């Protein structure tokens, strides 16, 4: 459902901007049109965003267990929230590069940790309070701005990220990860060099998990977790 809404938003933005361009081309220069309206932005854009994170967190590659009555492990993390700051450099009206640094929080599912303990090691382990998984991605994205005129400007992008991962969850260690990222968004420009940004990014991320001895005893239990977080953000930007 969320991806369908993104597609609708993207197509709507293209339609609006195509109509805006036609109107702009037909405006006579002798009219009262303000030529500086939306035309005074610079080649640098700084953005700050907050958003929600949707992650599947499915595990793959768990070793064969010896439990007589095994239980399903399920997803290791819940959806979360986060934010990022970015700088976009425009090479021309259509092409740009965005460098961003984010901080995201996912909640671990202790039912999954308890299932791992049951299947591979220590039963009835006390896990304490929920502890988050932190994802800190540094991302470089190449962008194509489809309609770089008017007040509504959609863009698409593709890039690469390296994500520093850590957690305070009992019995769990998560490795860093890196992979591709896809991006789609819209900038809504105002007259005073500010903008509102709606941004959707699909991160591809499969970090390695390692379970500690307090969960699995002296066994070595590792897996790959398919996080692939989808981050939907809204924020404010400033042009320079």
From Swiss-Prot:
Q: Which InterPro entries match?
A: OMP/PagP_b-brl, OMPW
A single cellular component GO annotation: cell outer membrane
For this UniProt record, the keywords arranged alphabetically read as follows:
Cell outer membrane, Membrane, Signal, Transmembrane, Transmembrane beta strand
Localization, per the record, is: Cell outer membrane
**Where is the secretion signal located?**
1-20
Gene Ontology biological process terms, A to Z: transmembrane transport
**Pfam families for this protein:** OmpW (PF03922)
> What family, per the record?
Belongs to the OmpW/AlkL family.
Classification via PANTHER family: OUTER MEMBRANE PROTEIN W, PTHR36920
Its protein name is: Putative outer membrane protein RT0057
